[in-house]
Amino acid sequence: MEFLPKKIDDYACLHSQEENQVLKDLNRETWAKVLIPRMLSGHLQGRTLSMFSKMIKPKNILEIGTYTGYSAICLCEGLEENGKLHTIDINEELKEISSKYFKKAN
């Protein structure tokens, strides 16, 4: 997150839950293969989305802008049992990456 001072960002990341392996791999692949990787939600934003989702326990989530799927995977961590996430994106070229990681995340 580039909009926070580095010391605050470092502190928040240090005291946040670690990325699971699927998210680490997705993060790495996005930065290695995608043209504008900074659009990825990333570790701190992902943990924040996960926390909100776990607090609310939504039955349904609509995400507009899938990108490579990082934020969608984080949001799913708090879904109610049998809940559903609907995510849409205009860029079909990224669907292969997001679909692969959605399957890995289960």
Label every model-predicted segment.
Residues M1-N106:
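A short alpha-helical cap/connector motif
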